[in-house]
Design a protein with these regions (language model features):
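Membrane-embedded alpha-helical segments of integral membrane proteins
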Residues: 14-72
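Transmembrane alpha-helices and immediately adjacent membrane-cytoplasm interface residues
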Residues: 59, 63-73, 77-109
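Membrane-interface segments at or immediately adjacent to transmembrane helices
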Residues: 99-164, 176
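Post-HExxH zinc-binding segment in Zn-dependent metallohydrolases
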Residues: 125, 130, 224-267
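Auxiliary, metal-adjacent structural segments of Zn-dependent hydrolase domains
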Residues: 139-196, 202, 206
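Intrinsically disordered, low-complexity segments enriched in glycine and mixed charged residues
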Residues: 340-412
Length: 412
């Protein structure tokens, strides 16, 4: 039998193509310049046309067919071959459908913090946006998360300004899985890499779910790296005219920026947030924690960390926090920089001038918006509720007050 008639040969070829450290210029030209714009036209139409998850439906259909084949007399051998070839096809197509996105030119310097003054300006600009949008945004979210088509348009707008490449077509639906289906494993959203189909866990409250939806839509726009997807999601929401999207993104961005502050300055910054903001974060963290299985989440996190490292993401899961640095560098795409005497935040609410601490020094508060709880819980990440942050702002004691460390691991 010839080697290329064996499924495992093709499967190994797919793995090899995925692990090759393709030059960014090649990934930009092939993936961003050709494959993604063409393939997304097909996937966006399919995903937008069907309210339920196509990816989940195909998976269930495949499992049913496999069981039927196994039960059929003499069908075990055929079932094994079919399963092998299905795996080979998935591995071969993954690099072109999504995997090359990890090799593209970064939208911001990787692993480099911006100037300290830039973080202070970002905190002020984001706080101003949070104060302005809290009232109308929370009122809108009381009726549910905003329409996915609106979020899709906001993400597409930012994506077009960030990259000099043909614009991909984004889906206008984000599929809801059964509550807890993702949060149990420590994640709040996921994108199907072959169909570019975004999903979220509806076990989260509306503000957090909106942040997750933005993050997953950013993945469908070709931002495979977690830090870039999160930064694009926050930029898209902050600049969005929809008040619910703007509030959800502002809350997530403020949470991430707060994490970089020393404890006292963090507390002062959080104290300047509008009424209800801290409660919204706490509600997201509580919802994520109510579903999370510590053992399962830890195992999935280790696996996903290894996956990210294998695709060239330095630090694996640590990439999530780099979104803060990218957000600060690119914030002018969404919000104008406040002038010296401008904005609600200056004077009355500004804290910490240029001070900040490294992401891993945030101590008692983990702020993570989406994906995982990790990311923004979709932004707010859900979970390492082992840190107690004492009393916050108005004197309300909350575990992991900024509500964040958890939950947002989004990803594939």
């Amino acid at each position: 039998m010839r080697p290329f008639s064996r499924w495992w040969v093709w499967a190994l070829l797919g793995v090899a193509l995925l692990l090759v450290p393709w030059p960014a210029a090649v990934a930009d030209a092939v993936y961003l310049g050709a494959v993604l714009p063409a393939w997304s036209v097909v996937t966006a139409a399919l995903v937008s046309a069907v309210p339920l998850s196509l990816s989940a439906g195909l998976l269930l259909f495949g499992l049913a067919a496999l069981v039927a084949a196994l039960l059929w007399p003499g069908g075990a051998a055929r079932a094994g071959q079919a399963l092998g070839w299905a795996l080979a096809v998935l591995l071969l197509t993954f690099p072109l459908a999504f995997g090359l996105g990890y090799r593209t030119t970064p939208i911001a310097p990787v692993g480099e913090a911006a100037a300290p003054a830039a973080y202070a300006a970002a905190r002020e600009a984001v706080l101003t946006r949070l104060l302005v949008t809290a009232g109308p945004g929370r009122a809108a979210l009381a009726a549910g998360a905003p329409d996915a088509a609106v979020l899709s348009g906001c993400v597409a707008d930012v994506a077009a300004r960030l990259r000099d490449a043909p614009s991909p077509t984004l889906p206008t639906r984000v599929k809801a899985l059964p509550p807890g289906a993702l949060l149990t494993f420590g994640f709040s959203g996921v994108v199907s890499p072959w169909l570019l189909e975004p999903h979220l866990d509806p076990g989260l409250p509306p503000a957090a779910a909106t942040a997750v939806a933005l993050h997953e839509l950013a993945h469908t726009a070709g931002f495979a790296r977690e830090s870039e997807a999160e930064a694009v999601a926050l930029l898209a929401g902050l600049g969005c005219e929809d008040p619910a999207a703007a509030y959800a993104a502002a809350l997530a961005a403020a949470s991430r920026l707060a994490r970089r502050l020393p404890a006292e300055e963090r507390q002062a910054y959080v104290a300047s947030w509008p009424e209800g903001a801290v409660e919204d974060l706490a509600a997201a963290a509580a919802a994520a924690a109510s579903y999370r299985s510590g053992a399962l989440a830890a195992a999935v996190e280790r696996a996903y960390d290894a996956y990210l490292v294998s695709l060239g993401t330095e630090g694996g899961m640590a990439d999530y926090d780099r979104s803060t640095d990218a957000l600060v560098r690119l914030l002018d795409l969404a919000l104008p920089a406040p002038s010296a005497g401008d904005g609600v935040a200056r004077g009355r609410h500004a804290v910490g001038g240029g001070s900040q601490v490294a992401a891993d020094e945030g101590g008692d508060v983990g702020v993570a918006p989406h994906e995982a709880p990790e990311q923004h819980l979709g932004v707010l990440a859900v979970a390492r509720l082992q840190h107690r942050a004492g009393e916050l702002a108005a004197g309300v004691g909350v575990e992991d007050p900024l509500g964040l460390e958890a939950a947002e691991r989004v990803g594939v």
